[in-house]
Amino acid sequence: MPKLQGFEFWSRTLGGARHVVAPMVDQSELAWRLLSRRHGAQLCYTPMLHAQVFVRDANYRKENLYCDVCPEDRPLIVQFCANDPEVFVQAALLAQDYCDAIDLNLGCPQMIAKRGHYGAFLQEEWDLLQRMILLAHERLSVPVTCKIRVFPEIDKTVRYAQMLEKAGCQLLTVHGRTKEQKGPMAGTASWEHIKAVRKAVGIPVFANGNIQCLQDVERCIQDTGVQGVMSAEGNLHNPALFEGRSPAVWELAEEYLDIVRQHPCPLSYVRAHLFKLWHHTLQVHQQLREELAKVKTLEGVAAVSQALKLRCQEDMSRQQEGVRPADNLPAFHWICQPYIRPGPREGSKENSGGRSKRALEEEEGSMEGLSKNKLKKQLRNPHKTFDPSLKPKYAKCDQCGNPKGNRCVFNLCRGCCKKRAFRETADCPGHGLLFKTKLEKSLAWKGTQPGLQEAQQVRPVTPSGFSEVVGSALA
Ligand SMILES: Cc1cc2nc3c(=O)[nH]c(=O)nc-3n(C[C@H](O)[C@H](O)[C@H](O)COP(=O)(O)O)c2cc1C
């Protein structure tokens, strides 16, 4: 069957999806996607996957895609970050049988994307992007799509979108914030930019940014004319957003934990989800926040969830009629609701007390005083300095651009070093890889075994023969 394109792809393959769960590193994992789909999401994206790692590392492919196959988890778009046409296409070819389209991340504004040269840091490299999209469009059996951030100028954003469309992009998600609008500087997304793109291209467009409830979805579609709306933070705080419901926070937590039992994921993902889902409740019941941070098992998390449910139910039963929710919240803390991130200097209860780790980290650079955690660290080590300019700079792996191991003899990251050391039967003590030493030991041992010596002469040991000896070291 010929590959469907543009609007036909959106309406037939994606079922005309309007309610879309965003790609979210460590957060749009299978269990969360299934929860969101049960509550109105019609299309989900995987978290961003690193194309180069996906190509070279079979375990990464298994852990991040192949083991997460589930018939209810469709339609699904797999997102990659990449900056090389061949690598992008190789990764996409390995993923295309497990999804309905491949998305290129052109929106990540984080430092890690700057260092790895991907995401929004490719925004100015139109020639490279054209080549990446064109090659993917030609070689893949599924459509290629892009998720972009806007430029400050509407006309440049429009030309950018048109360039991607011309190269073969079949669906565009426009996050209406610029690369600089992140963390405490995120502000609001510009639907004006999104509307202008929608008018100027002939492919379906999803809007992203400022979506906190179902009314926002309807308003955004009306104002901008887009085909669908994507939500990240709104979905994390209320996965029933697309149903237009705001359930009790423990209800969705319990349902999510049940799904995680069937489709396990790292505990760090689960914890991060619950911190968001319970954001407002944990402001009130700080003890539970600490317990959640400390638990080490899924059953431990379930126990915290049970305790939180009881506390919330007590709070509900004590609630007097006519009393409004505290802190100008739209609903009481036990109801799933949006979290509006405070601006850079905005005064709020959060700014005076138990703020999130992330909020503290984001302001790190601009704070004159030190956070509680940093003060504690300084007490333990009086010579510790928190001046960002004195932080050691990450040196890059010569091969893939990830941070290299400090003591690596090859100047590579662990993954690349392991491959090279294996190929060359070498040691890298910095990474604890001892292929050469193990081979020598194994040969010495074989030398002491009379029966084996004979076999040795018939079959000389080469690096590939070596794999039989230490194959398990690579598992
Ligand atoms: C926890 C988290 C992880 C994210 N990871 C990704 C990602 O992997 N790929 C991507 O394109 N955007 C990622 N984003 C950005 C979102 O997809 C989205 O563009 C952004 O949050 C704006 O949407 P919102 O206003 O609905 O939050 C992430 C956002 C969050 C909150």
Swiss-Prot record:
Region Disordered: start-end pairs: 343-388
Q: Which GO terms describe its molecular function?
A: flavin adenine dinucleotide binding; tRNA-dihydrouridine16 synthase activity; tRNA-dihydrouridine17 synthase activity
What range does the record give for the signal peptide? Answer: none
Going by the UniProt record, its keywords in alphabetical order are: Cytoplasm, Flavoprotein, FMN, NAD, NADP, Nucleus, Oxidoreductase, tRNA processing
- InterPro entries per the UniProt record, alphabetical: Aldolase_TIM (IPR013785), DUS-like_FMN-bd (IPR035587), tRNA_hU_synthase_CS (IPR018517)
One Gene Ontology CC term in the entry? nucleus
Grouped into one coarse class, the protein's main location is: cytoplasm
**UniProt: FMN binding residues:** 23-25, 79, 147, 175, 208-210, 232-233
Q: Name one GO biological process term.
A: tRNA dihydrouridine synthesis
From the Swiss-Prot or TrEMBL record, give the protein name: tRNA-dihydrouridine(16/17) synthase [NAD(P)(+)]-like
* Native species: Mus musculus (Mouse)
Instruction: State the taxonomy lineage.
Output: Eukaryota, Metazoa, Chordata, Craniata, Vertebrata
